[in-house]
Amino acid sequence: MLAKRIIPCLDVRDGQVVKGVQFRNHEIIGDIVPLAKRYADEGADELVFYDITASSDGRVVDKSWVARVAEVIDIPFCVAGGIRSIDDAAKILSFGADKISINSPALADPTLITRLADRFGVQCIVVGIDTWFDDATGKYHVNQYTGDENHTRVTQWETLDWVQEVQQRGAGEIVLNMMNQDGVRNGYDLTQLKKVRDVCRVPLIASGGAGTMEHFLEAFRDADVDGALAASVFHKQIINIGELKAYLAGQGVEIRIC
């Protein structure tokens, strides 16, 4: 059995790490490189960096900080933000990233997933899915351009349909960003995770809602996700990664101990 992964998420805007609640009202957390090093030193299995306004601004993630991160950490990291072409991805990977993640650009051009997977291998291609539960329809819908609330829009895709579509096109991993839970710290949406797990054949990462160590345990035990991504509980030092891993190991979760 592969070890479960603990993945701090660093949302980047204007060269700094920020964090919002339900993808809105972002506050500045700190500088990118020191935070990345701190999480690596604490025992994170990998890091994810999202330049949250790159796609809506029509630009690609700033590669200068990607190179600086690669110099100070020795764990895998994934970068997302406005990647629209093989050339965009190649440049980010050449600066030291281990994976690239696409979200809004994949919705705009789903063939991008296949082209990237064919060029770099599926193990390198992550698709992020920003999913929102609509009380009015009782359905989960995929959202686009969520890094800027002025540009966010609901797409035609229901979440489960998009999960299956991106797998068929070559996604090697899926990060499910559950917008209703984001930053609220009341637990992952286990109902949604279980539904996605039933149709997801590639590694599945839960994102949005972690507030306690028990929330991580529930995601691993009840929804069988491969990794759990979180931001605010790590940024605000509510949970220490080393202590979290010790707790999970004590509960029988296969995890890499620092």
From Swiss-Prot:
The keyword Lyase applies. The keyword Electron transport does not apply. Its EC number is 4.3.2.10. GO terms for biological process: L-histidine biosynthetic process. It catalyses: 5-[(5-phospho-1-deoxy-D-ribulos-1-ylimino)methylamino]-1-(5-phospho-beta-D-ribosyl)imidazole-4-carboxamide + L-glutamine = D-erythro-1-(imidazol-4-yl)glycerol 3-phosphate + 5-amino-1-(5-phospho-beta-D-ribosyl)imidazole-4-carboxamide + L-glutamate + H(+). It comes from the Bacteria. Pfam families: His_biosynth. Pathway: Amino-acid biosynthesis; L-histidine biosynthesis; L-histidine from 5-phospho-alpha-D-ribose 1-diphosphate: step 5/9. It is found in: Cytoplasm. CDD domains: HisF. Heterodimer of HisH and HisF. IGPS catalyzes the conversion of PRFAR and glutamine to IGP, AICAR and glutamate. The HisF subunit catalyzes the cyclization activity that produces IGP and AICAR from PRFAR using the ammonia provided by the HisH subunit. This is Imidazole glycerol phosphate synthase subunit HisF. It comes from Salmonella dublin (strain CT_02021853). The gene is hisF.
